[in-house]
Amino acid sequence: MSSGGLLLLLGLLTLWEALTPVSSTDRPEFCELPEDSGPCKGLFHVFYYNPDQSQCLEFIYGGCYGNANNFKTIEECKRTCAA
């Protein structure tokens, strides 16, 4: 196969991987953590993955501490945690 064909195949495989949903076995453990606003008083609209509802939901983040189940965009949340 030519190098151009290999590059095309590599690009298609990369795209396939990016578009394939995350399965529950591949989901990072932090996706199971509850929403955590943290102790600070900010009002940041962010998203977390809710494993009981199997979807990303919005919550208010205070701006400090909290946990890793905290995403700036719903797209990032879905890409990381949603099955």
Curated annotation (Swiss-Prot):
GO terms for cellular component: extracellular space. InterPro entries: Kunitz_BPTI (IPR002223), Kunitz_BPTI_sf (IPR036880), Prtase_inh_Kunz-CS (IPR020901), TFPI/VKTCI-like (IPR050098). It is found in: Secreted. The keyword Secreted applies. CDD domains: Kunitz_textilinin-like. Expressed by the venom gland. Keywords: Disulfide bond, Protease inhibitor, Secreted, Serine protease inhibitor, Signal. Disulfide bonds join 31-81, 40-64, 56-77. The record marks 41-42 as: Reactive bond for trypsin. Its main location: secreted. Residues 1-24 form the signal peptide. GO terms for molecular function: serine-type endopeptidase inhibitor activity. Residues 31-81 form the BPTI/Kunitz inhibitor domain. SMART domains: KU. Serine protease inhibitor. Belongs to the venom Kunitz-type family. This is Kunitz-type serine protease inhibitor nigrescinin-2. The lineage of its organism: Eukaryota, Metazoa, Chordata, Craniata, Vertebrata.
